[in-house]
Amino acid sequence: MGQSVVVLGAQWGDEGKGKIVDLLTEEIGAVVRFQGGHNAGHTLVINGKKTVLHLIPSGILRNGVLCLIGNGVVISPAALRKEIEELEDTGLEIRSRLKISPAAPLIMEYHIALDQAREKAAGGRAIGTTGRGIGPAYEDKVGRRGIRVADLHYPDQLAEKLRAALDYHNFVLTRYFGVDGMDFQRIYDEMLVFAEYVEPMKSDVAGILHDLRKQGKRVLFEGAQGTLLDIDHGTYPYVTSSSTTVGGALSGAGVGVQDIDYVLGIAKAYATRVGGGPFPTELDDKIGQGIRDRGVEYGASTGRPRRCGWMDIVALKRAVAINGITGLCITKLDVLDGMDKLKICIAYEYHDKRSEYAPLDAQGWEECTPVYLEFPGWNESTHGITSWEKLPPAARAYLCALEELAGCPIGIVSTGPDREHTIMLHDPFA
């Protein structure tokens, strides 16, 4: 039987999953995206060259690796085509290696208009979405009015479904938000063009995954966003619209729990968050700004500055428990170089009581005050180090503390953006 590893974010996203997925894809059969859409921004740096992927799995830069987009992903036709063409312009062969589930929902133009109208109307109460139609597309999926890749094969039924969806969404756009509605014919014509384009890539992703496992191939499941943004387990309502946990990998790709052999949780050596929502360890001072500057903490998809703070073990332990994380990968250790002291949040003060568990609602999180342990920093550079023994003693002590406090072993440490800037303590496929 083959081996399968799930790679997912153990914080609020932006943990560096793309680099780690690329690192682990050297000798595997396939990489599969199972949730989210082009709101993801997975940055890969190989020999100093930067590539940012939004929809296509990070294994695409490895020759011969099959890249799959599962039924749990919402697909923007325009974004997908743009990303494919940009990669093909670099000389990569894409379409023969990219397989897309017919059950994947499409992000339509009216989803984007609705997303942006909502955020504008919400003002200071906005969730902080990317404005790319992700949430409304998932709403249509659950509301059973979504248009899926499979629908493109049937022009008459597509027209019928599109008219029904437009009747609903144009009413909301024009009557509730007071913005322009969408034109049926233009969108329909665009969908017919996309139907022809995507047809050769359409394939039974779940079936491919089952066959690969029987053939003894290695498969990597690539998560987007992070556990604390999960629609069920995150800081609701300041969450994304999909399941970012290991449960999302099962339902979003079409595999069973017995098909997963290892869950790798990715976490930065500190913490970041984009958009609104509670963030107990946030540093709204020069220390936080310093981390942002050194870590280049700006969104790969939106360019928005990320909020920065100390490592939050309470939140990390929750991610470990929810996902059954087998091992952790700690990224961006080098960003902490040169800091006099470091802090790790080990508990919260909540309503005059100390708790090592996170509240289950956003308001509760907002009312938490972090309890910190302080650690000495280090002046030596860790950038590009590939051996545990060569890390400064204080850096090793910090990582050992993270491991002990989280109750989960650290298998990988990333010391820079390049594929080679990595300390491999345990290979998830070993």
Curated annotation (Swiss-Prot):
It catalyses: IMP + L-aspartate + GTP = N(6)-(1,2-dicarboxyethyl)-AMP + GDP + phosphate + 2 H(+). GO terms for cellular component: cytoplasm. This is Adenylosuccinate synthetase. The gene is purA. HAMAP family: Adenylosucc_synth. Belongs to the adenylosuccinate synthetase family. It comes from Xylella fastidiosa (strain M12). Substrate binds at A300, S301, T302, G303, R304, P305, R306. IMP binds at D14, E15, G16, K17, N39, A40, G41, H42, T130, R144, Q225, T240, R304. Pathway: Purine metabolism; AMP biosynthesis via de novo pathway; AMP from IMP: step 1/2. Keywords: Cytoplasm, GTP-binding, Ligase, Magnesium, Metal-binding, Nucleotide-binding, Purine biosynthesis. GO terms for molecular function: adenylosuccinate synthase activity; GTP binding; magnesium ion binding. It is found in: Cytoplasm. It is an enzyme of class 6 (ligase). Pfam families: Adenylsucc_synt. The active site is at D14 (proton acceptor), H42 (proton donor). Binds 1 Mg(2+) ion per subunit. Mg(2+) binds at D14, G41. Homodimer. GTP binds at residues 13-19, 41-43, 306, 332-334, 414-416.
